Amino acid sequence: MVLGISLALAACNQPDKKGDETKTTGSTGTAKKEVAQQATIDAAKAAPNLYKVVSDTMGIRIVEVTYKPGDSSAWHSHPDYAIYAAEGGTATFYGKDGLKMENEMKTGTIMVRHGEFHSVKNTGKTTLKVILVEVNRPMGTMAWDAANDAVKVAGNLYKVAADTLGIRVLQINYKPGQSSALHSHPDNALYVIEGSKGEFTDKAGKKTVVELKKGMMMIGPAETHSVKNIGTTTMKAILVEISRPMK
């Protein structure tokens, strides 16, 4: 893919219970003992009204998350993931240990987090919209052309925002006319913040022009290419690179 295509880049309703198992009430802590025994509870299945799967392939999943003020979810889980706050807000996270934490996420916040199990409520006054990139891959290394790392080759265009757990988040910024030398990315997920038109040239010299629209999201395999912004507007994106082997 291009933009890695290269510019190629939390929740949820309780699952059904049987018999007299503990019920979840307005206070998520009441189900603490039951929740501790739950296995994986996919947020997108538990709360499809809050979690929308945009793309799911190669052990990488992009999920668009939207919580309006007052929206809440029951217990659910996430594997290791990266998060980008497209529209900031305030949310309270409830852990299975009974602890709760209020988190004010400003627009543009970027994090990489371990897999976790929680419930969430929007306790702010604005809609919270985040992009989640979940990684369903084991820890380890994968083969890619690290010698031509985009950050080393074009550090003025690719900035590291977070790098841990084999997940690296890059902030990408190409002004009109700017271009990069040939560089590489491992498998990745892309979220376009501000769109433009990009020209991608692969190792063989083949050129591909892509209209990168605001809000575009995609997952792409490792690749090597150069990029040029041939549009008239600045191109900004978040690229989540995954340096882990597939299962």
Residue map of PLM features:
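C-terminal motif of bacterial Sec signal peptides marking the signal peptidase cleavage site
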Residues: 8-11
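Surface-exposed beta-loop interaction hotspot
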Residues: 129-165
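Short acidic-glycine-tyrosine-enriched beta hairpin
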Residues: 55-56, 97-115, 206-222
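A short glycine-rich, His/Asp/Glu-containing loop-to-beta-strand
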Residues: 48-72, 80-83, 151-179, 187-190, ...
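Glycine- and acidic-residue-biased ligand/ion/polar-headgroup-sensing regions
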Residues: 78-97, 185-204
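Bacterial signal peptide processing site
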Residues: 13-15
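Histidine-centered metal-chelating micro-motifs
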Residues: 70-73, 110-121, 179-180, 216-228
